[in-house]
C-alpha cells in the first residue's frame, strides 16, 4: 500500500473550509449590497406609493357624482365671495329710488330691491358673510372640540366625565336658540353671530372626536405603543390623530353647512349682519314686505342658501364614501 501523506489529508479540508468561507463572505457582501440598494430605493418607492394613492383617490372622486356636484357648488360659493371682494356691479349703499323693484335688465341682472339696490351685487356680497361665518365658526368648533375630545379620550375618569357632561348639557338646547341667547348677551353683529355659532359647534366635535379616539385607543397598536413606554400625548399625536382626521373632515363640511344656515337665520331675525352690509338672511328679511309684489326678491337669496348647503352636504357625503375603507369595499 502507498502511504498517504498526512499533510495532504489535513490540507484538503482546510482548502474546502477556505473556499466555503470565501463563498459565505461573498454572499454576505452581495446581501449587504442588495439591502443597501433596497434602502436607497425605499424613499423613491414610498414617494411612488403616495402618488399612486393620491391618483387613485382622485380617480374615484371624479367618478363619484355627489362629490363632483358638491365640489362645483362649493367652488361657486368661493368664487362668488372672492370676486365680490374686488368687484361688484354696484355697492351695497348705492340706492336708486327711481328704480325700485325693477325686473331683470341689462343694468340690473337680477333686478332691484325695495330700496333700489342691485340684487346681483347684494347676492355676491352676501356670499362673503356666509363663507366667513362657515370658516371661522367651524374653525372655532373644530379647534376647541378636537382638543377637548382628545383630552377626554386620553384621560378617562373625572376629566372625561366633566367634558362629556358639559357637551351633553350644551347639546340639550336647540342650535338657533343657543345662538340667539349668545348674541342677545354679547350684542348683534356678524362677529358675535359667528362666535355664537362656533361655540355651539364645539360639543358636536367633542363627542365625535372622543368616540373616534376611544376606538383607536382600544386597538392593539395603541396598546403596544403604551407598553413600549410612549406617553398619552405621544400616542395621540402618532396614532390617534391621523386615524380620526378623515372623520373630522367629513364632520367639518356638515358643520359648515349648519353655520351658513345659522348665520342666515340670525341675520334674518336681526341678530346677525346689520345694514347696510348685505347678507342672504338679511335679503330674505327685506323681501318679506314685498313678497307678493316681487316674489323673486326672496327667490334669489333662498336659492343661494339652498345650493350652498346642498353643495356642502354632497361634498361631505362624497368624502365619507371616499375616505371610509368599509364603504370603499362595497
Question: Model regions: which residues?
Answer:
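Transmembrane alpha-helix signature in integral membrane proteins
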Residues: 119-151
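Generic hydrophobic transmembrane alpha-helix motif, especially the helices
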Residues: 109, 113, 119, 143, ...
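Transmembrane alpha-helical segments of polytopic membrane transport and secretion proteins
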Residues: 1-72, 314-330
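Membrane-interface helix starts
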Residues: 59-74, 131, 135, 292-299
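C-terminal transmembrane helix and the adjacent membrane-cytosol boundary/short C-terminal tail
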Residues: 199-200, 246-256, 295-330
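Glycine-rich helix-loop "coupling/hinge" segments at transmembrane-helix boundaries
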Residues: 171, 182-185, 197, 212-213, ...
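Hydrophobic alpha-helical transmembrane segments of membrane transport/permease proteins
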Residues: 5-7, 28, 72, 76, ...
Amino acid at each position: 500500500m502507498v502511504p498517504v501523506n498526512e499533510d495532504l489529508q489535513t490540507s484538503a479540508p482546510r482548502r474546502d473550509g477556505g473556499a466555503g468561507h470565501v463563498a459565505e463572505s461573498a454572499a454576505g457582501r452581495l446581501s449587504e449590497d442588495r439591502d443597501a440598494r433596497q434602502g436607497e430605493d425605499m424613499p423613491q418607492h414610498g414617494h411612488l406609493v403616495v402618488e399612486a394613492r393620491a391618483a387613485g383617490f382622485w380617480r374615484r372622486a371624479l367618478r363619484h357624482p355627489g362629490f363632483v356636484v358638491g365640489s362645483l357648488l362649493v367652488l361657486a360659493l368661493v368664487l362668488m365671495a372672492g370676486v365680490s371682494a374686488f368687484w361688484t356691479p354696484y355697492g351695497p349703499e348705492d340706492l336708486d329710488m327711481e328704480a325700485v323693484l325693477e325686473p331683470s335688465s341689462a343694468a340690473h341682472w337680477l333686478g332691484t330691491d325695495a330700496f333700489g339696490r342691485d340684487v346681483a351685487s347684494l347676492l355676491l356680497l352676501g356670499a362673503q358673510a356666509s363663507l366667513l361665518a362657515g370658516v371661522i365658526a367651524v374653525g372655532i368648533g373644530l379647534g376647541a372640540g378636537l382638543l377637548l375630545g382628545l383630552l377626554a379620550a386620553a384621560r378617562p375618569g373625572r376629566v372625561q366625565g366633566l367634558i362629556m357632561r358639559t357637551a351633553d348639557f350644551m347639546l340639550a338646547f336647540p342650535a338657533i336658540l343657543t345662538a340667539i341667547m349668545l348674541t342677545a348677551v354679547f350684542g348683534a353683529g356678524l362677529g358675535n353671530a359667528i362666535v355664537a355659532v362656533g361655540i355651539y359647534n364645539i360639543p358636536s366635535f367633542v363627542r365625535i372626536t372622543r368616540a373616534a379616539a376611544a376606538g383607536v385607543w382600544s386597538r392593539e397598536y395603541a396598546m403596544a405603543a403604551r407598553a413600549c413606554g410612549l406617553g398619552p400625548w405621544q400616542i395621540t399625536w402618532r396614532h390617534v390623530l391621523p386615524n380620526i382626521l378623515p372623520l373630522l373632515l367629513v364632520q367639518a363640511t356638515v358643520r359648515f353647512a349648519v353655520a351658513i344656515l345659522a348665520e342666515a337665520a340670525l341675520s334674518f331675525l336681526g341678530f346677525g349682519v346689520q345694514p347696510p352690509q348685505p347678507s342672504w338672511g338679511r335679503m330674505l328679511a327685506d323681501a318679506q314686505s314685498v313678497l307678493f309684489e316681487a316674489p323673486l326678491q326672496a327667490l334669489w337669496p333662498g336659492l343661494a342658501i339652498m345650493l350652498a348647503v346642498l353643495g356642502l352636504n354632497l361634498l361631505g357625503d362624497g368624502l365619507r364614501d371616499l375616505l371610509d375603507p368599509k364603504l370603499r369595499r362595497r
